[in-house]
Amino acid sequence: MLIKALLLAFMSSKITSISFATSFIFKVYSKCASFRVPSVSKLLRESGVAKIGVAPFSLASFANVFASKFSPSYWDTSKEPTTSQYELFTKYDAFGEAEYKELAAHCKKHEIEFVSTPFDLGAVDMLNPLVRYFKIASADITNPPLLKKVAATGKPVILSSGASNIEEIDAALTILRSAGAKEICLMHCILNYPTRNENAHLGMLIDLRNRYPELLLGYSDHTLPNEQMTSLISAHLLGAVVLEKHFTLDKTLPGNDHYHAMDEKDLLRFQKNVKQVHELLGPSRAKAPIATEEISRLNARRSIVLTRDLKSGHKLSEHDLIAKRPGTGISPMNWDEVIGRSVSRDLPEDHILTWDDLTKP
């Protein structure tokens, strides 16, 4: 039984629904056969990522159920020299059902969201009591038996779309919906480890948003982390409400994931940056002045002002008026209403007109 586990955490302070619409979700990923549950538990308790509610762990096991002995690599072999998927996953992925149950229990105890990607039908049955929703890997978007099995649980589904075209996405969505999936989040993904910035094609999120307005969108990121965590921030601004990123304790560890993953420093940097972005975005609301603009609104806008001294009873024309700051008098938006009106008293040049200065029409 193969399970490629994801541990996700909601960065919002409260989860009101399993629906992803109100939550910012983050996947972190790591795998190494030398890890054991006690060391992972310690990591979850003590690491900085645990403090912000993100679990830094994911494994796959039993390569024989999803990769033939003749399956070639699809990662950067200059970073991970193993050229066979079967050999790589046999070498590094070692957790089974007991370990996943223990991890799920530990996550529940520490209020960390546990979710896993099943890679075979039996894994769906094993995971179903442990998770609130399922993640389907890009590689299985064309695997109808697995899609149907996951959808039949009735739980929300995160569907990755790496290396897929629109026809394949449509087909997968049709299968999921017909088999019982009600809530689906579609993930943009480039199935290339690592993904160069010019190949990330975050603009595809715009196309996916236009094609599937009824779906929630996400982004599974395989670019190398940078100081600004640009890819994740950009995807979020383009509408991705679910973000997925590989995580490791040590980028030098062997395997096809560590060398392009984020570490604890990257994750904390991302948290800081996304907090700043959320501050910049503010709440979604109709365009209107905010409290700190009131003084500027008053003093930086213009009023109708006299260009010369005028005697009481003078009938105003274009030549008598100019728009000047501040905006404490009659607004230039009322220009046409003022033209032709008479002044009610003597007024000096540069006087800011008010309605009291004019006779009634």
List the predicted regions and their residue ranges:
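Low-acidity, Ser/Thr- and Arg-rich intrinsically disordered low-complexity segments
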Residues: M1-S47, P56-S61
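Catalytic cores and adjacent flexible loops of soluble metabolic enzymes
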Residues: R45, A55-P361
